[in-house]
Amino acid sequence: MWDLKSEWWAVGFGLLLLLAASAQAGGLAPHHYTPDWPSLDSRPLPRWFDEAKFGLFVHWGVYSVPAWGSEWFWWHWQGEQSSAYVRFMKENYPPGFSYADFAPQFTARFFHPEEWADLFQAAGAKYVVLTAKHHEGFTNWPSAVSWNWNSKDVGPHRDLVGELGAAVRKRNIRYGLYHSLFEWFHPLYLLDKKNGLKTQHFVSTKTMPELYDLVNRYKPDLIWSDGEWECPDSYWNSTEFLAWLYNESPVKDQVVVNDRWGQNCSCRHGGYYNCEDKYRPHSLPDHKWEMCTSVDKASWGYRRDMSMSTIVDENEIIEELVQTISLGGNYLLNIGPNKDGVIVPIFQERLLAVGKWLQINGEAIYASKPWRVQSERNKTVVWYTTKDSAVYATFLHWPEDGVVNLQSPKMTSATKITMLGMEGELHWTQDPLEGVLITLPQLPPGTFPVESAWTLKLTKVN
């Protein structure tokens, strides 16, 4: 006999199965996270982040106006009262000039987000992280809790966060936002510290409203938290925010976060680990991590006083990228635009060099996994990755005799070896002592597809 109740039950159950399958296909299965680290740390990292491998960091704010020393200019000048910074201000600015007086000069006059996005795409970046707010407290979007200290009210009179996000997403580049939890000189933060952190005036009226606003307004794929180190996560209400982010926010299924959410959180809690600036482990970690570094070794923000001696060589960038990916990390490379929104030519040159290398060798980078052996050193340093049953061996220096020897791969009679960017198979032999000996192509100088870090692809190896 036909039963209406049974039929509706069957339809409802089928819809639930369909929704569950859909959620799993999109990344993460439905799960409720509680505001504590054991629960939050159990959340799987969305797959896109590990597959992306290479991102770009952009430090841009009012500190781009004095553009001297580093993006910590305000703190060094009026927090530490460094003699060098005090002297710089005395020699270049009139008496009574305040840090806030720099803001109108932060014009972003030549900021063309489409051009930036084109550059980032040409660099091979799969995600971009912009400083929405650094420790100075100036927000690069029209924050309601940062009156007259944001990019809409003063300076550019533009929503910098929104404009760049729209441009990069047109190119299928993931968009992340850096946000500093603390601010050096905010009166409410100083009051909370004076009260021994027994009050949370700053958190409730500034930090948390900003974070919720950023997520709801821009729906970032990544939140790069910083400025956490002076206070425990209980002061910042970090676990409550992350539980909301993972359970209820509009980006709950795809958002990725780092580990800077309070004292003692770094390298212990959160999504992936930064551990420290320019962190570089010596062996394969058991947790997903990211190395963040800067083209200008002495600063994250733009400096008028930078010199070529502080600019990282393109070969060094590529070597760091290769090493980082082989050890299971992501590589986040920083540049600092100037106050007018110009990415200076030397920074563009470095980014385009990375992009050129990735056009040839990206197969060994994007969506790869660490191999059972991460590196070896014989005639040259070799770093390994693997993907789709192939093994990739990237060697950093061309051997003088034109022969690369690999100790780790176990060859079979069906093994084939090619070089990315070159046609044809390479000749190889197996030696019981030296391992696999691979004869490299003999071509005139300047005719190789890349000038450093060449990648061998090995198929059908044990």
From Swiss-Prot:
One of its GO terms (biological process) is lipid metabolic process. Alpha-L-fucosidase is responsible for hydrolyzing the alpha-1,6-linked fucose joined to the reducing-end N-acetylglucosamine of the carbohydrate moieties of glycoproteins. Its EC number is 3.2.1.51. Its main location: other. Residues 1-28 form the signal peptide. Homotetramer. Belongs to the glycosyl hydrolase 29 family. GO terms for molecular function: alpha-L-fucosidase activity; carbohydrate binding; fucosidase activity. One of its GO terms (cellular component) is lysosome. The record marks C292 as: May be important for catalysis. It comes from the Eukaryota. It catalyses: an alpha-L-fucoside + H2O = L-fucose + an alcohol; a neolactoside IV(2)-alpha-Fuc-nLc4Cer(d18:1(4E)) + H2O = a neolactoside nLc4Cer(d18:1(4E)) + L-fucose; a neolactoside IV(2)-alpha-Fuc-nLc4Cer(d18:0) + H2O = a neolactoside nLc4Cer(d18:0) + L-fucose. It is an enzyme of class 3 (hydrolase). Glycans are attached at N237, N264, N378. This is Tissue alpha-L-fucosidase.
